[in-house]
Amino acid sequence: MGGDIFGRELRLISFGESHGPVVGAIVEGAPAGLPLSEEDVQRILDLRRPGQSELVSQRAERDRVEILSGVFNGFTTGAPISMIVRNEDIDSSYYEEISRFPRPGHADYVARLKYSGYNDFRGGGRFSGRLTVSMCMAGAVAMKILEKLGIEVMAYSLEIGGERAEGFTLDDARNYRYMNPVRAPNEESYLRMAAAIERARREGDSLGGIVEAIALNVPPGLGEPIFDTIEGDIAKAMFSIPAVKGVEFGSGFRAARMRGSEHNDPIRVIDGKIRYKKNDHGGAIGGITTGEPIILRVAFKPTPSIAKPQETVDLELLRNVEIKVKGRHDPCVVPRAVVVVESMLAFTIADHIMRSMRGAI
């Protein structure tokens, strides 16, 4: 099973399964001398941990990180940083019962085809949102690199179930997003989004939504044309997050309905520096960062595990059946995905910084 490594100079190796003993991350290429503790990583993990409100999964995981290597006396050594989180609240009996009935919207069927039935299917195995634990652990390391360079990465729930956040500032989002369980940028949108999630939960259904992410103070010149563009690598990082169905930068798909005279961002001298007057390009042109904020939006599908009856098949008897998915699932993955988006955005930018600086920061 491949596809477990992300990055070039800064590399994340993800391992583990949803119902296995651990979920882990190995980060290779991090420079020596970064201050890093288990508390630093734990702070990021706690932002995605389940069971923190009725609006998310009630799986009772502590998600306590253990750093096994690569850190000594509170600083990175330059060696690979290996980290694990132990899976504690596991009940696989239901997944044994339904192994012959692939769940609609999940990777059960395609995984069975690809790996001839040898894959660990419990809780979705390698395809579970549980694997975002490894992304958050790696993101904590990347954020230390960005912090040293004054780069800030933030994300928030822009839209859930058609309820879109409005009337907020960047400071509103920065200060409020982790003060509410929905990760909304202001109180008004939080109340609407929370009510929508609760309605779907009561009805045995689920919702999708959009996470907006911004990276500030990113230097110009990161990225390469054609196959190593900054947007391409960020998009790949986002699509590695389970449930992601779309990514757009700047004006995104709205650009298809604009004229060139509207979309082109004027270049001006502002306070003695060359800047763009607006940012429809979203922080990158030609695959290379411009120095303006990187702005992207990530679309998440509704959680496929729902309590309503769904049509599927019996793989052994080859007949059509109905299934009702049980378990402790998020009625909407968006709130817990916000910090995962931040983590993977931070990791991608840090990787490109390491490329441009040949590993020295």
Curated annotation (Swiss-Prot):
The keyword Ion transport does not apply. Pathway: Metabolic intermediate biosynthesis; chorismate biosynthesis; chorismate from D-erythrose 4-phosphate and phosphoenolpyruvate: step 7/7. The keyword NADP applies. It comes from the Archaea. It is an enzyme of class 4 (lyase). Its EC number is 4.2.3.5. NADP(+) binds at R48. Reduced FMN (FMNH(2)). GO terms for molecular function: chorismate synthase activity; FMN binding. PROSITE patterns: CHORISMATE_SYNTHASE_1, CHORISMATE_SYNTHASE_3. One of its GO terms (biological process) is chorismate biosynthetic process. CDD domains: Chorismate_synthase. Keywords: Amino-acid biosynthesis, Aromatic amino acid biosynthesis, FAD, Flavoprotein, FMN, Lyase, NADP. InterPro entries: Chorismate_synth, Chorismate_synth_AroC_sf, Chorismate_synthase_CS. NCBIfam families: aroC, PRK05382.1. This reaction introduces a second double bond into the aromatic ring system. This is Chorismate synthase. It comes from Korarchaeum cryptofilum (strain OPF8). The lineage of its organism: Archaea, Thermoproteota, Candidatus Korarchaeia, Candidatus Korarchaeales, Candidatus Korarchaeaceae. The gene is aroC.
